[in-house]
From Swiss-Prot:
Signal peptide: none annotated. This is Rho-related protein racA. GO terms for biological process: actin filament organization; cortical cytoskeleton organization; establishment or maintenance of cell polarity; mitotic cytokinesis; regulation of actin cytoskeleton organization; regulation of cell shape; response to bacterium; signal transduction. The keyword Zinc does not apply. It comes from the Eukaryota. One of its GO terms (molecular function) is GTP binding. GTP binds at residues 11-17, 57-61, 115-118. Residues 182-197 have a biased composition (Low complexity). Interacts with pakB. One of its GO terms (cellular component) is cell projection. The keyword NAD does not apply.
């Protein structure tokens, strides 16, 4: 089986790695991870002949201009890639990539590759595209072997590209051209062998670059929104609704949660969405005209039992005697958590279905039917949907609004209305924050001066919905405040987002990047973000040479510097081997007297 070495070059973030991964795995990678140097392999059949195709990925950033050419020896064919929606990457072919290959590996065939073809014609991107005609003109001008336009996302022309590359590498014309090449052509060993008869010198072999290792995986902590909502329900704290039953103990709940979860209760309490039916009239509720409800009593109430400010009213609802407490409490639990609580199939599930259908809550009926039909494994997806829906509806109805508010936060002199039931149970710190011992003035909590309004609003939105606007906000500020409030899942979300920002910000080059990665590492160390700390340590260590030249490097403590130096990539022994290799090459050039062509 003939072995073919194919090297891919081009600017950072044009899609080189995606091209190789999509070709070798038939799958598109979900996230961009800047390549240091990586290798892939594939066994393919072209024109009935088997080939072992060695695929060499390279880093396009200028930080690796010295090391990248060490991947070029014995190359059979190059792919120079540019993004069709990045004119700068196209212009760099003539300015950088072609001269680099011509210098280090003359006479090796080159195929020009346009990537991200799926973005062609997307006018909303507002980026100047490179036309196929321009690419073909460049092919003719520089003498490339051909041009192929591809999409790794859609698998467009991938097989055609690599088939062309293999045919180009194995064509008689290419073999003839390689024989004319310098040391870095694939036939350099035979060239040097013949030359050694007069020079008694052989071409030094470049040192093998050790792998850099993969970046640490950042795990997102699983949402516990349903468990937190159950804790809120069971605690009965801040409740402003009491459901009563004939000769059974009552069920306490919260209007803001019931309204966020159910159109039926929005109509009962009078806080409807534009898509809801009209609210029930109080007279109809008290005259038995609304199914399942006997009466509704509303009483003014300024204080909760613990002495803290209430939502202003306390509502008592008498439930019809045809509904037993267990079934009704299951309904309320399901509204809060999205989880169906039952012992077995005989645990009054039919009665629960009847109640759910009478109040128009189809999701509870579906969950019960799934259990009865042996499809209970479908219920977790219903719960996830309901948790998200509750959060989104609570945001629409109540977020920062005075309606039913029972607490205010003062941040940077601005007042923010909130609802204790919707933020309770998220963490012990949050619970302490809204408890009676912390509140300095009636129903108000004044945040410290170092808390910014925008970051606090992001935290509050997360407390309501289990989602935070990290992309639109200050992700670092949100992480710092999330750690202060002991919101570990939010911290993990910020860690992942910031890690992706690091990868995106360094596509132009690590030394030139405006992002302060060392500052992010120090922040992660100070604010209990261990996953981000490990990611930054790996990134700085894996890009040691450009990172150590940044002025922020001096801010690192001795322990951190030692860790980075001990784990630096490329390792010191490899860099020393590179220096020795370069010295040997210089000696060889000096002694070759003309037969070595630069």
């Amino acid at each position: 089986m003939q072995a073919i070495k194919l090297v891919v070059v081009g600017d950072g973030a044009v899609g080189k790695s995606c091209l190789l991964i999509a070709y070798t795995t038939n799958a598109f990678p979900g996230e961009y991870v800047p390549t240091v140097f990586d290798n892939y392999s594939a066994n393919v059949m072209i024109d009935g002949k088997p080939f072992n195709l060695g695929l060499w990925d390279t880093a396009g950033q200028e930080d690796y201009d010295r090391l990248r050419p060490l991947s070029y020896p014995q190359t059979d064919v190059f792919l120079i890639c540019f993004s069709i929606v990045s004119r700068a990457s196209f212009e760099n072919i003539r300015a950088k990539w072609y001269p680099e290959i011509l210098h280090h590996a003359p006479n090796i065939p080159i195929v020009l590759v346009g990537t991200k073809n799926d973005l062609r014609g997307h006018h909303d991107l507002k980026r100047p595209e490179v036309s196929a005609a321009e690419a073909n003109n460049l092919v003719r001008e520089l003498g490339f072997s051909g041009y192929v336009e591809t999409s790794a996302l859609l698998q467009t022309n991938l097989r055609e590209l690599f088939s062309l590359a293999i045919r180009t590498a194995t064509s008689p014309k290419s073999a003839s051209a390689k024989k004319k090449g310098g040391f870095f052509s694939s036939s350099s060993s035979s060239s040097s062998s013949s030359s050694s008869k007069s020079s008694e010198k052989s071409v030094p072999i470049p040192p093998v670059m050790p792998p850099a290792g993969k970046a640490p995986w950042i795990d997102i902590i699983t949402s516990s929104y349903d468990k937190e909502m159950r804790e809120t329900l069971n605690s009965e704290s801040f409740s402003d609704v009491k459901f009563t039953f004939f000769e059974e103990r009552p069920v306490y709940a919260h209007r803001v949660i019931l309204c966020s979860a159910s159109e039926f209760f929005r109509r009962v309490f009078g806080y409807t969405l534009s898509s809801d039916q009209a609210e029930f009239k109080l007279d109809d509720l008290n005259e038995g005209k609304v199914k399942n409800i006997r009466s509704v009593t509303i009483k003014p109430n300024e204080k909760n039992d613990d002495g803290t400010k209430s939502s202003g009213e306390f509502v008592e609802i008498s439930i019809d005697s045809s509904i037993n407490r267990r079934v009704f409490n299951r309904f309320i639990e399901f509204l809060y958590t999205g989880v169906l609580n039952y012992l077995d199939k005989n645990d009054q599930l039919q009665e629960t279905i009847a109640l759910a259908e009478s109040v128009g809550f189809k999701y509870l009926a579906s969950a019960c039917k799934n259990v009865l039909g042996g499809n209970e494994d479908l219920n977790p997806s219903i719960g996830t949907f309901l948790n998200d829906q509750l959060g989104e509806t609570s945001k629409e109805l109540f977020f920062t609004k005075k309606i039913l508010s029972d607490i205010q936060f003062i941040v940077e002199g601005r007042s923010i209305f909130a609802h204790k039931a919707l933020i309770f149970s998220r963490s012990n710190v949050v619970n302490a924050l809204i408890g009676r011992n912390f509140i300095e003035r009636e129903g108000k909590v004044e945040m410290s001066d170092d808390v910014t309004f925008d970051s606090f609003m992001a935290i509050l939105e997360y407390l309501y919905t289990a989602h935070a606007p990290i992309e639109e906000g200050d992700s670092v500020g949100i992480l710092v405040l999330g750690n202060r409030f002991d919101l570990r899942r939010l911290v993990s979300l910020c860690e992942l987002y910031i890690s992706k920002e690091i990868e995106r910000a360094t596509t132009i080059g690590i030394f030139r990047s405006e992002l302060d990665i060392i500052g992010l590492l120090i922040c992660a160390q100070r604010h209990n973000a261990p996953q981000l700390e490990k990611f930054c340590l790996h990134f700085i260590s894996s890009n040691y040479q450009p990172m150590r030249r940044r002025k922020e490097f001096a801010l690192l403590d001795d322990k951190t510097k030692k860790h980075i130096e001990d784990n630096q990539w490329p390792p010191i022994h490899y860099l020393r081997a590179v220096e020795d290799y370069e010295k040997e090459m210089e000696k060889l050039k000096s002694s070759s007297k003309g037969w070595f062509k630069k």
